[in-house]
């Protein structure tokens, strides 16, 4: 059964890119709800787009490896809140790669004057997590990583350009919902999202209470004997 195809230039409140052909309705819907979820989670975020591949010998466990990669990446950044929208792609060579749009909560960070340092550290942690997950050397891992966003995109609901920027970003991301030659798209394995768990403050160890002698009611028990 073929997917419904969107030929118009809009989906809900967003303009979408249909220049090179129609978009899959199930894919654009999945992308839309993932995107709106991120915007509702973060009022101010930095957006980093990149693509990661894996050695072909790991193709059969690609999804599991990228799950491991994300949780390892979050382990490196325990104080960050992160959401990621991913799109799986199969290249002509048969290699599998994932396109990621990462949203980093900007609240703990200084203004974008430090954009380079933020992006540099993100790049380092993303690469390190992938190298460890796929057991690939640091020398070879660069061939599997492609970083697309330079500089980072800043989405801030308090800025006048927010409405324009977040609409432009969705327009760019809508290209990921294009139909492949096989219209029977498995939506769940093609587009999805990762969300970092909120850091929970561990319970402080309970201090032992000092035992206090209870005053006994004289009407029910006899008074203690004198020494």
Predicted regions located by residue number:
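Alpha-helix initiation and capping sites
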Residues: 60-63, 79-80, 91-94, 120, ...
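Low-complexity, flexible helical/coil segments
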Residues: 81-88, 136-139
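Catalytic "initiation/cleavage/transfer" segments centered on a nucleophilic residue
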Residues: 1-42, 108-227
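Signature for HUH/AEP ssDNA processing cores
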Residues: 32-85
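Residue-level marker of positions within ordered structural domains that often coincide
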Residues: 55, 105, 135
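"Short basic amphipathic alpha-helical interaction patches in structured regions
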Residues: 64, 99-103, 112-119
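Histidine-centered divalent-metal-coordination microenvironment in nucleic-acid enzymes
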Residues: 84-109
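N-terminal low-complexity, charged segments
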Residues: 68-75, 95, 153-158
């Amino acid at each position: 059964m073929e997917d419904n195809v969107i030929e118009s230039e809009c989906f809900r409140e967003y303009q979408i890119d249909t220049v090179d052909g129609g978009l899959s309705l199930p894919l654009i819907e999945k992308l839309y709800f993932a995107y709106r979820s991120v915007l509702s989670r973060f009022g101010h975020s930095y957006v980093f787009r990149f693509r990661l591949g894996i050695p072909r010998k790991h193709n059969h466990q690609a999804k599991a490896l990228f799950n491991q990669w994300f949780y390892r990446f979050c382990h490196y950044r325990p104080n960050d809140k992160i959401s990621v929208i991913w799109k799986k792609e199969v290249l002509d060579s048969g290699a599998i790669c994932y396109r990621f749009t990462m949203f980093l909560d900007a609240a703990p960070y200084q203004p974008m004057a430090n954009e380079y340092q933020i992006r540099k550290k993100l790049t380092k942690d993303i690469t390190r997590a992938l190298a460890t997950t796929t057991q690939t050397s640091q020398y070879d891992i660069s061939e599997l990583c492609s970083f697309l966003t330079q500089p980072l995109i800043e989405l801030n609901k308090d800025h006048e350009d927010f409405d324009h920027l977040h609409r432009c970003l969705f327009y760019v991301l809508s290209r990921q919902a294009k139909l492949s030659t096989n219209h029977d798209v498995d939506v769940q394995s093609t587009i999805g999202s990762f969300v970092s768990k909120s850091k929970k403050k561990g319970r402080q160890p309970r201090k032992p209470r000092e035992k206090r002698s209870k005053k006994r009611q004289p009407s029910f028990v006899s008074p203690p004997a004198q020494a």
